[in-house]
Amino acid sequence: MAENTQNPAAGTAPAKPKPAVPGAAKPAAPGAAKPAAKAPAKPAAPAATAPSGVYKPPVDRPDPNPFKDSKMSGVASWFQERFYVLNPIIDYMKHKEVPKHRLSFWYYFGGLGLFFFIIQILTGLLLLQYYKPTETDAFSSFLFIQGQVPFGWLIRQIHAWSANLMILMLFIHMFSTFFMKSYRKPRELLWVSGFILLVLTLGFGFTGYLLPWNELAFFATQVGTEVPKVAPGGAFLVEILRGGPDVSGETLTRMFSLHVVLLPGLVMLVLAAHLTLVQVLGTSAPIGYKEAGLIKGYDKFFPTFLAKDGIGWLIGFALLVYLAVMFPWEIGVKANPLSPAPVGIKPEWYFWAQFQLLKDFKFEGGELLAIILFTIGGVVWMLVPFLDRQASQEKKSPMFTIFGLLVLAFLLINTYRVYDSYVLHLPK
């Protein structure tokens, strides 16, 4: 039998207690309250991060509308609460100043040009209600406006006269700006945008001249669109403008679309840029006036200068109505492409100087030479602010003053020559 080696007392001996684990909780005494369960610790809130994961510190943003509790009148407060974002612009205009000196009078012609442009838009919209841009109906629609529409004759006359006055004001504004050297640094782009506005305005005059579809306008357009043919690529452009080899009903519709759609849109864009530059850059005094003490003070642009500008607008409107009533433009007779051209065909007065130069250059290649001279002269005139380095340094530049006088003399003398030949002494 195998020997039993186990200790008989081994089954009854108590087991030794295990040593306590450091940090372990002790058992609660009998009857003692159970300790509260420890809530799990919340993780720390992550720092504010952008969607890309870049940390951005919190920003204390002010009330987006600090004027909502304004104590102004009810109407003013209502508008101020909704258009408060414009307040910085209004404050800027309140602090904007215009220098006063003996030549300040010339500052108002730019505003008059803008006023007559607004008149053009308003009267043009009224005329559009009745005008029909077709070869068969254009002239008769003018007769209807003139004779049947209430005050239609007055609207047409105001539209015609405001177009001429607008161009006249722009010429005066351009030359007064030139001789005061207001184009100098940093106003170069102000001059360039003004020159572009003048060119677009002349385009208004050229495209609107044909719209009555009378005999004089028809043959003047025929002659005027012949001139660019001598230039390289000119024949192609003329055919696009005319809608064919000759002036026809297609030409009328194309002139109409240019006059009421394309040119107004371009003028609005350039005019917005021009007026913005005027506000940002301010009004310039002639060279040396500040140093010589010739500036008598400054007018607040708002409301003082604008109030004076408004007085000029009222005077301009009175002159416009007087001319429209006392010196009405005639309608003439309906255009007949098969009839011979009448005696004394000429463009509008603002093209007379160029028209006279074309007449003077009757030799072979003369028309092309005249076009080249017009183009070079226009480019040089537009780039004057960049060419006149002395004016940019606040120094007088007599050479450019002489250049401006020569240009003005060319325009005035040739304009008078056409007036003398075609108005005063036109053979009957």
Curated annotation (Swiss-Prot):
Keyword terms, alphabetized: Cell inner membrane, Cell membrane, Electron transport, Heme, Iron, Membrane, Metal-binding, Respiratory chain, Transmembrane, Transmembrane helix, Transport
Biased composition range(s): Low complexity: 21-51
GO MF term (any one): electron transfer activity
Region of interest (Disordered), residue spans: 1-67
Any one cellular-component term (Gene Ontology): plasma membrane
Main function: Component of the green S-bacteria bc complex, which consists of the Rieske protein and cytochrome b subunit but appears to lack a cytochrome c1-equivalent. This complex has a comparatively low redox potential.
Protein name (Swiss-Prot/TrEMBL): Cytochrome bc complex cytochrome b subunit
Pfam family, one: Cytochrom_B_C
Keyword Lipoprotein: no
UniProt-annotated location(s): Cell inner membrane
Cofactor: heme b
Binding positions (heme b b562): 159, 259
Record's keyword annotation contains Iron: yes
Additional free-text comment from the UniProt record: Heme 1 (or BL or b562) is low-potential and absorbs at about 562 nm, and heme 2 (or BH or b566) is high-potential and absorbs at about 566 nm.
Bilayer topology term: Multi-pass membrane protein
SUPFAM superfamilies: a domain/subunit of cytochrome bc1 complex (Ubiquinol-cytochrome c reductase), Transmembrane di-heme cytochromes
Family: Belongs to the cytochrome b family.
The record's free-text note on cofactor binding: Binds 2 heme b groups non-covalently.
Organism of derivation: Chlorobaculum tepidum (strain ATCC 49652 / DSM 12025 / NBRC 103806 / TLS)
UniProt-annotated binding residues for heme b b566: 173, 274
Compositional bias of kind Basic and acidic residues: 58-67
BP GO terms, sorted: respiratory electron transport chain
Transmembrane segments: 108-128, 160-180, 191-211, 258-278, 310-329, 367-387, 399-419
